[in-house]
Amino acid sequence: MKNKPDDRRDNVDKIQYNITKTIQNCELADEMIAKTDDEKTKKTLIEKNQRRREALDGMREEIKDEARDKKNGYM
């Protein structure tokens, strides 16, 4: 079986999609935090959003790297 060549042309788009969805999930969780009285649920959502924000930092760095590599022709 032949290996597929590494096709990174749409990586920037994929990462941007993931960033957008992660931000939407954070916003939805923030709404739930504001509406719920359940402290356990609030704590869980706050922790999850913290992990999402950390992931966003990583994705933003990754998208910069991919955009630079795309501009340079993926050499």
Curated annotation (Swiss-Prot):
Residues 48-75 are annotated as: Disordered. HAMAP family: Tlp (MF_01506). This is Protein Tlp homolog. Belongs to the Tlp family. InterPro entries: SASP_thioredoxin-like. Disulfide bonds: none annotated. Coiled coil: none annotated. NCBIfam families: SASP_tlp. It comes from Clostridium botulinum (strain Loch Maree / Type A3). The gene is tlp.
